[in-house]
UniProtKB/Swiss-Prot annotation:
Belongs to the universal ribosomal protein uL4 family. This is Large ribosomal subunit protein uL4. GO terms for cellular component: ribonucleoprotein complex; ribosome. One of its GO terms (biological process) is translation. Gene3D superfamilies: 3.40.1370.10. The lineage of its organism: Bacteria, Pseudomonadati, Thermodesulfobacteriota, Desulfuromonadia, Geobacterales. Keywords: Ribonucleoprotein, Ribosomal protein, RNA-binding, rRNA-binding. Residues 50-89 are annotated as: Disordered. One of the primary rRNA binding proteins, this protein initially binds near the 5'-end of the 23S rRNA. It is important during the early stages of 50S assembly. It makes multiple contacts with different domains of the 23S rRNA in the assembled 50S subunit and ribosome. Forms part of the polypeptide exit tunnel.
Length: 206
């Protein structure tokens, strides 16, 4: 069974946490990670891009000039694609990019990622992350004490002080344990978790 050091906010080791080997020592399945990331990014797309065809552009009901006698090529509508302000030919239309993934596969992808991060020593576990007051300076000092830069902080339920202290610090994201996802785990170099969040994640990924 894998274990990891447990720290307090002063970076003092106060014990060890036993981790579920099914979650943190799982077989790494890169194709599943790729699939889960692809699905998550696709589902974020709004798909609302839209251009108007010649039938949808307002105006242009009148023939620009008579059919014959001007020397110009015949035209029937000033909103045709060759005119400035005319409609677009084969332009993008609204569509859904949504993809699906089985719950079992999504959980396996997260287990693979957490196992990779633990093996790379990118996970830090604390007994709690709590601040007595709202202070970006205190939070930045805490991050510096642990030599953390691009970090994903996962807690059971972020306190108001923690949320407000961290929100103005670049390259840091605060996340509830039940919101753990493939994109954020890949995006951030380090994962900081409370002991309670570890247990919630283990329960969710069984």
């Amino acid at each position: 069974m894998p274990t990891i050091a447990l720290y307090n906010m002063n970076r003092e080791k106060i014990g060890e946490v036993a981790l579920d080997e099914q979650i943190f020592a799982a077989e790494v399945k890169e194709p599943l990670i790729h699939q889960a990331l692809k699905v998550q990014l696709a589902n974020r797309r709004a798909g609302t891009v839209k251009t108007k065809t010649r039938a949808e552009v307002s105006g242009g009901g009148k023939k620009p000039f008579k059919q014959k006698g001007t020397g110009n090529a015949r035209q029937g509508c000033s909103r045709a694609p060759q005119y400035p302000g005319g409609g677009t030919v084969f332009g993008p239309q609204p569509k859904t990019y949504n993809l699906g993934i089985n719950k079992k596969a999504r959980k396996a992808a997260l287990r693979s990622l957490l196992s990779m991060q633990l093996k790379s020593e990118k996970i830090t576990v604390l007994d709690q992350i709590e601040f007595a007051k709202i202070s970006t300076k205190d939070f930045a000092g805490f991050m510096k004490k642990f030599d953390l830069e691009r970090s994903l902080i996962i807690t059971e339920e972020p306190s108001t002080n923690l949320a407000l202290s961290s929100r103005n610090v670049p390259y840091v994201k605060l996340l509830k344990a039940d919101g753990l996802n493939v994109f954020d785990v890949l995006k951030y170099q380090n994962i900081v978790m409370t002991e309670g969040a570890v247990r919630l994640v283990e329960g969710a990924l069984q």
